[in-house]
A protein has these predicted regions:
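Amphipathic alpha-helical segments at domain termini/boundaries
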Residues: 1-18, 160-199, 208-220, 227
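Conserved CoA-thioester-binding segment of acyl-CoA-metabolizing enzymes
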Residues: 1-53, 89
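Hydrophobic/aromatic residues within transmembrane alpha-helices
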Residues: 52-53, 65, 113-115, 172, ...
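Glycine- (often His-adjacent) and acidic-residue-rich active-site loop
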Residues: 54-86
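Short, active-site-adjacent cap segments at secondary-structure transitions
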Residues: 57-61, 107-108, 216
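Short helix- or helix-capping micro-motifs
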Residues: 62-64, 156-164
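Glycine-rich beta-to-alpha active-site loop
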Residues: 87-136
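Hydrophobic, secondary-structure "cap" segments at the distal end of domains
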Residues: 144-155
Length: 227
């Protein structure tokens, strides 16, 4: 079973996180699957857009795989953490419009992943969005902080990071953590509507705007790589 599936519907690539057993946890195997998909998407030259969804109706991405983490040395964990930063950075600056279709729980690293996408839609009736790092005692790196800070509501970012508060889709929309919240049967159709509108934009202009919106993250990545 592929951990991540990719298919094309017209001019829209649908990337499906496909680890129903573990809730699309992040571990080296998952990061490798992300890199494979990103390599395919980075080679796309025609106008397109990307939706990232999940085959699991309960979870979109619940963050680090703690079962895997228990057996890792500090050095191994640091290496995986850096790879996570690199993969999420690739998603942040992918030269195609990206839409997160959040079908369920979006926690910790999963919430960071959602934050780097251009737009976010979330299920309104079930599922939590939360930065749970404070409760699991894993502080964000400077790069991951800048990724979380891409969310437009800075007050919400501060509160969610410092409290670990879990919010549902409706509250996430009110706090502008997600752009829209919908019942499950409307979630993917609405994501497709947005993606189909976005792929028609001039990609050169779109990506120039994206670089401006995410310039603090870009600067932080450059600083860390030169340190």
């Amino acid at each position: 079973m592929a951990l991540i599936k990719i298919e094309k519907k017209g001019n829209v690539f649908i990337v499906t996180l496909n680890d129903k057993i573990k809730g699309n946890v992040i571990n080296p195997e998952a990061l490798s699957a992300h890199r494979k998909v990103l390599t395919e998407l980075e080679a796309v030259s025609e106008n397109s857009a990307v939706i990232v969804t999940s085959s699991d109706p309960k979870s979109w991405c619940v963050g680090l795989d703690f079962e895997w983490l228990k057996g890792q040395s500090a050095e191994e964990f640091t290496g995986t953490f850096r790879e996570l930063e690199e993969v999420f950075g690739q998603w942040a600056f992918l030269a195609l419009p990206t839409v997160g279709c959040i079908t369920g729980h979006c926690l910790a690293g999963g919430a960071i992943f959602a934050s780097v996408l251009d737009f976010r839609l979330m299920r309104s009736d079930k599922g939590w969005f939360a930065f749970t790092e404070i409760d699991v005692k894993i502080p964000l790196s400077p790069i991951l902080y800048e990724m979380a800070d891409l969310l437009p509501n800075k007050h919400a970012v501060r509160e969610l990071l410092l409290t670990g508060r879990r919010i549902g889709g409706a509250d996430a929309q009110k706090l502008r953590v997600v752009d829209e919240a919908h019942l499950p049967d409307m979630l993917m159709p609405r994501a497709l509507e947005i993606a189909e509108e976005l792929y028609q934009k001039d990609l050169k202009t779109y990506n120039a705007m994206k670089q401006l919106l995410k310039q603090n993250l870009s600067k932080r990545i450059a600083e860390e790589s030169n340190a």
